[in-house]
Amino acid sequence: MEDPYLRSFALFFALFNPFLMSIYLLDLIRGLPTQVFSRVLVRGSLISATVFILFAWGGEAFFRDYLQVRFASFQIFGGIIFLLIGLRYVFSGAHAITAMRDNPSAMAGSVAMPIMIGPGTVSASVVIGTRLPLPGAAAVIFGTLALTVVILVVMKVLHDRLKQRH
């Protein structure tokens, strides 16, 4: 696997892991109609893509020059944030994300930020930005997000069909 585009796609797709993401989105899969669920995912993906492309473009210099922190510090802080989100899931259950929003436009932001945009995916976008020219990095980011959305919507449709049968 020497192609930098394929390696970048594999890295980003492995971090997104739509099968694991479906567990985080289970309350939305169960509670929203397919059309609303799809709209929320697309909006969340567009928010995420914008953030990832900015980090692919700015890279580590953004952390060093503008935020004045080392990139490793960001990753540690991101891990702490995920620990807190995980604890909220443990104590609140699948309704932890539902409590953060009440309408579909707010859902897109809450799907993007704690689920899609995290220290691992931001780190991956920085790596992709160093491997590829910006248009190529943007194509990989959009392609990976599009595939993730398609897989999640297909899983939602399958869930709804199985739910109707049983």
Label each region the model flagged.
Residues 22-28, 147-164:
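Transmembrane alpha-helical segments of integral membrane proteins
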Residues 38-89:
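Membrane helix-loop-helix hairpins that form the core translocation module of multi-pass transporters
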Residues 1-15, 92-112:
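Small-residue-enriched transmembrane helix starts and helix-helix packing motifs
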Residues 2-10, 64-75, 130-143:
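Interfacial loop-to-helix junctions that mark the boundaries of transmembrane helices
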Residues 27-39, 103, 128-136, 160-165:
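Juxtamembrane helix-boundary/capping and inter-helix hinge elements in multi-pass membrane proteins
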Residues 40-49, 132-148:
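Entry/N-cap segments of selected transmembrane alpha helices
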